């Protein structure tokens, strides 16, 4: 462990946010060690915000090289970077944003992530993986007692899942015209258990009606990488959800065409929400995502569901 005391240079750089959330919160950020899995366009947004906030260390894990498509989708990447490792390009650009944050890279494959790698970090943020990969990494973060975020964007849609295990935090309340800090505590489920908990046979009718069509649609994408109506219906069958209640024909007809691209505004919103929530959880400020957040840019809705 390095020196986690905030020095004069850092106080000057982070002065505005120290005034906003306090010295202790900034100290907690400096002590944090975050593993960001994949150098995706979404990870681009998240990494930028984390590094500018002054976390202690960020490690970008990605084994891919830069292609022309990356140049089109990521503001970190330029045409001259084609052929280089994405993780190395990320490291260079992130260091330019904030030289005070330690930036590291890992070019391992996703399948090579093990307990030894995860144990070095206090938080893991995984982006653009499939369902099984998300769940496997979440199992490792629980073994290592590390906070976990899973997040992806699909065209006009995005989601974030949060597993902070057992999380203590504080929120500000106004009591008798006086601001007081109230201690809070939540217990969260691992991703696999949380997603299996939405079974139609165990839901009350009132709750079943609140399940958005976007839920089985996204789960179909995560599990099978398929977005056609039949695949989405299959998810409803597996989760014992009432198709007539959950599925919306008009939505299904548009969903497939709305996920075939990466749209920067959506990634900015999702990346901003995930990074801010991660910063809040590190500093133990504000109520975190508990535990599944969906963003629908088409409707402008962004509900949170407690699975």
UniProtKB/Swiss-Prot annotation:
Name the GO cellular-component terms.
Answer: cytoplasm; cytosol; nucleus; SUMO activating enzyme complex
Described by its record, this protein's role is as follows: Could be involved in a ubiquitin-related process important for DNA damage tolerance. Acts in a process which is defective in the checkpoint rad mutants and which involves hus5.
Q: What Pfam family does this protein match (any one)?
A: ThiF
Against PANTHER family, the record matches this protein to: SUMO-ACTIVATING ENZYME SUBUNIT 1 (PTHR10953:SF162), UBIQUITIN-ACTIVATING ENZYME E1 (PTHR10953)
Which UniProt key words apply to this protein? DNA damage
Q: Which GO terms describe its molecular function?
A: ATP hydrolysis activity; SUMO activating enzyme activity
- The answer to whether UniProt assigns keyword S-adenosyl-L-methionine to this entry is no
> How is this protein named in the record?
DNA damage tolerance protein rad31
Matching entries from CDD domains are given as: Aos1_SUMO
Any Gene Ontology biological process: mitotic chromosome condensation
Q: Which organism is it from?
A: Schizosaccharomyces pombe (strain 972 / ATCC 24843) (Fission yeast)
